[in-house]
């Protein structure tokens, strides 16, 4: 019997074993990475806006969390994914993650004078119906959570679409947009940072259509629907990320405190968590951890 060829004290058979082990190890590592990083980028068609919308998606269960971005939303990948660590915060919690991109300076509403911004229609009709048909998600009883402009929209969408959303979270949202000081700040900030005219959005303030999109005006709907709320807004007056808050961080907590009083004192609401701390920032350094903090409350509500 011939001995196998040996070089430097290692047989060819030994080299083969080592090589196969490395290949198997690499295959296992790659498979593990594929399982751990389960995000997909979906291109969801919107007939209302006449284009496909990029949506980050991580499957986790039949019910989902819709994540809405701050004013300076990225065009291709939601800041909830890149800065808010949403995928890791909600991984393994039994819920799916849905995070659309491209909603910068839109307040996620249907703009009266801009057909390319029909976000309420997309978020409450086109997107959930598409996810039900293509990903098997439940069309009703889900959560919506937003930062900054996304927080404003989250409460408004939940108020008017309670079948879609039983849970709503607002982090540094402007919750009294129809108030005189607040609507002036929104109009000025969106013009400065986004180059948009809010009269194209909801028309002139004096015509009253801003009221329809004001969570504080419709707080009675949230109470009547028994929507579970999570509200966070620090008292910080300065902006660490001005574009995310259109430069008006000093308006955020006052708006949230007004909403709190209307919810608790005027309407007797008792299905909400309020966190209005002295410390913290209106940025992803606070919003990301808040999503993690609310995750148990959120999943207990929608699962």
Name what the model sees in each region.
Residues 1-36:
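Secretory targeting and sorting signals
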Residues 34-303:
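Non-catalytic cap/lid and distal C-terminal segments of serine-dependent acyl enzymes
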